[in-house]
UniProtKB/Swiss-Prot annotation:
GO terms for molecular function: GTP binding; GTPase activity; metal ion binding; structural constituent of cytoskeleton. This is Tubulin beta chain. GO terms for biological process: microtubule-based process. It comes from Toxoplasma gondii. The lineage of its organism: Eukaryota, Sar, Alveolata, Apicomplexa, Conoidasida. It comes from the Eukaryota.
Length: 449
């Protein structure tokens, strides 16, 4: 019931995804061979959200792994939980996308996409009542960004009424893996704005900061970063997988967090932050969790929520706690920091409580916020994009794959529109209602024309 089909694409997506399955399997008591060895019935009660039960009582993830080169797949297969996945669900090419969005979206990726869609259909048909899809990918490379967005648009066509949730790793401000990241990211955002329902924005620099500052790790690896991401991913879906006093699911999340259809890019945070080795020895209280969760240092993307205002936010608590206390703390945060919440959406915090905490913690909270501060991130990518595009640098790699410069211009203006939409709602007050309606009317007329 309420199944989620998970797709991971490209190197980044596959590495985050592999980590995610380690975390989820641990929570449900599934060992690397797919056998259940847990100690509580609750682990099995709704295990079919993420797993199929195969013959012999083995549990197989509803996961599809795709990439345009075999390298990452091989390392996932050789990894600790590599034997867990269904072998048919590894779909890969041989050529690689070479960090080129056009290769992932139009040429190499387009050749492979049909075999991916076949596997997606097969997984979707095995579901009782499909809730939606979750996709892990990065926006800086070629496969995760180009082929990832191609898959999203194809799945969108075929399953228009299912929720499409992505965990997208954006290029970081200071750490860059690829020179053409701004191009790839802008072209991807152009697609995500139209075809995704909720995008959880992650970036490596913020994750590094968390590792250095909060976890005091001297040399964080990608494994540590991905561990943080998967903690948040597991928190977003915990209400589907375990019983709770106040449930939420992907659709409720979307309904509560997306006030305007294009503004569905979320900041995510997690508390309490612990490094992989040292589990915390003291249990945090609900007020401490709430305080840590709203802390800018806890956000997994390099946008400071204090530079904008929250349109909406959602907190998913896990563990044994009183819902009354949760509600009080949420109100408390809103009252004390009312300037950081838009006043024209009253009660814009949603909370849910799930009784089962993650492994090794007494209680935890996952935070998902829709803040106008995220425009900083888009602005930054957009500036880098414009700097290169003005000189048409690196463009031949994209036009050589059959892309048109027009598409770049469109993606650029779509990104800039997104930034100004966020800005418009950040500046809006409750009094200006009338002016808004007129503007909306004019905009509507233009769109109609």
């Amino acid at each position: 019931m309420r199944e989620i089909v998970h797709v991971q694409g490209g190197q980044c997506g596959n590495q985050i995804g592999a980590k995610f399955w380690e975390v989820i399997s641990d929570e449900h008591g599934i060992d690397p061979t797919g056998t259940y060895c847990g100690d509580s019935d609750l682990q099995l009660e709704r295990i079919n959200v993420f797993y199929n039960e195969a013959t012999g009582g083995r549990f197989v993830p509803r996961a599809i792994l795709m990439d345009l080169e075999p390298g990452t797949m091989d390392s996932v297969r050789a990894g600790p939980f590599g034997q867990l996945f269904r072998p048919d669900n590894f779909v890969f090419g041989q050529t690689g996308a070479g960090n080129n969005w056009a290769k992932g979206h139009y040429t190499e990726g387009a050749e492979l996409i049909d075999s991916v869609l076949d596997v997606v259909r097969k997984e979707a048909e095995g579901c009782d009542c499909l809730q939606g899809f979750q996709i892990t990918h990065s926006l800086g490379g070629g496969t995760g960004s180009g082929m990832g967005t191609l898959l999203i648009s194809k799945v969108r066509e075929e399953y228009p009424d299912r929720i499409m949730e992505t965990f997208s790793v954006f290029p970081s401000p200071k750490v860059s893996d690829t020179v053409v990241e701004p191009y790839n990211a802008t072209l991807s955002v152009h697609q995500l704005v139209e075809n995704a329902d909720e995008v959880q924005v992650i970036d490596n620099e913020a994750l590094y900061d968390i590792c250095f500052r909060t976890l005091k790790l001297t040399t964080p690896t990608y494994g540590d970063l991905n561990h943080l991401v998967s903690a948040a991913m597991s928190g977003v879906t915990c209400c589907l997988r375990f019983p709770g006093q106040l449930n939420s699911d992907l659709r409720k999340l979307a309904v509560n967090l997306v006030p305007f259809p294009r503004l569905h890019f979320f900041l995510i945070g997690f508390a309490p932050l612990t490094s992989r080795g040292s589990q915390q020895y003291r249990a945090l209280s609900v007020p401490e969790l709430t305080q840590q969760m709203f802390d800018a240092k806890n956000m997994m993307c390099a946008s400071d929520p204090r530079h904008g205002r929250y349109l909406t936010a959602s907190a998913m608590f896990r563990g044994r706690m009183s819902t009354k206390e949760v509600d009080e703390q949420m109100l408390n945060v809103q009252n004390k920091n009312s300037s950081y919440f838009v006043e024209w959406i009253p009660n814009n915090m949603k909370s849910s409580v799930c009784d089962i905490p993650p492994k090794g913690l007494k209680m935890s909270v996952t935070f998902v916020g829709n803040s106008t501060a995220i425009q900083e991130m888009f602005k930054r990518v957009s500036d880098q994009f414009t700097a290169m595009f003005r000189r048409k640098a690196f463009l031949h790699w994209y036009t050589g794959e059959g892309m048109d410069e027009m598409e770049f211009t469109e993606a650029e203006s779509n990104m800039n529109d997104l930034v100004s939409e966020y800005q418009q709602y950040q500046d809006a007050t409750a009094e200006e209602e009338g002016e808004f309606d007129e503007e909306e009317g004019e905009m509507g007329a233009e769109e109609g024309a």
